[in-house]
Regions:
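Extracellular/virion structural assembly segments
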Residues: 1-211
Length: 211
């Protein structure tokens, strides 16, 4: 799990790719279909890290670069706009999702909660279901009145594999980020030691296609 936060002033470069297959049905009709419901994510991040954190990142890179291994890393973008908190007894988050295809292809993915007090929690996804307005299944003391659904999003109920260790209300949440299984997209790591205890590092990451 890579929890290092990027240099926010440098921005995040983000692109999507939707893989498709071309099928010949031998009747002169060619059709394309999506191989995966989820789009593939390509991301570039710039980090300003302490010596300890920089060494942890470089050690991870050399251990898993290329096809040697995979890791979880949040997108560090607001992919799920939370409309409930997460209760200790019911680890379910209701949110408007900007992730296309999340209802059909959520296996091996996780979500990361960034709280206003600085706490960060990552939990794997156990299930994603359409949210049914008025359903009692997701009501708890940590639900606060729903706003209108944001255009272009899907309102979903995300069941987590475990809770966050305590009740977390919506008001405590700064951001909820999609956290796909990822690998480094390049075998080259750019590291610039600007100080004996500060390194500027750029990495390129891509989400892993489910096969």
């Amino acid at each position: 799990m890579l929890h290092a936060q990027p240099n926010w002033s440098g921005g995040i470069d983000f692109s999507h790719l939707t893989p498709v297959d071309l099928v010949d049905y031998q009747d002169t009709v060619l059709k394309r279909y999506r191989k995966y419901a989820l789009e593939r994510h390509f991301r570039s991040y710039n980090f300003n890290l302490s010596r300890r954190d920089a060494l942890q990142l470089t050690n991870l890179f050399y251990r898993v670069r290329g096809m040697q291994g995979e890791f979880y890393m949040p997108t560090w973008t607001e992919d799920f706009i939370a409309y409930t908190g997460v209760s200790l007894s019911s680890p379910v988050l209701v949110a408007d999702s900007t992730i296309q295809g999340i209802l059909e292809d959520w296996e091996d993915a996780a979500v990361t909660f960034i709280l206003k007090n600085g706490e960060i929690f990552t939990r794997k996804i156990a299930a994603v279901d359409p949210y049914i307005e008025g359903s009692d299944a997701f009501n708890s003391g940590y639900d606060e009145g729903f706003d209108a659904q944001i255009p272009g999003t899907e309102r979903v109920a995300i069941t987590l594999t475990s809770g966050l260790g305590r009740n977390v209300s919506r008001r405590e949440i700064t951001m909820v980020s999609f956290t796909p299984l990822s690998r480094f997209a390049s075998d080259t790591l750019s590291v610039n030691w600007v100080h004996h205890n500060l390194a500027s590092i750029k990495i390129n990451v891509q989400s892993v296609d489910k096969t």
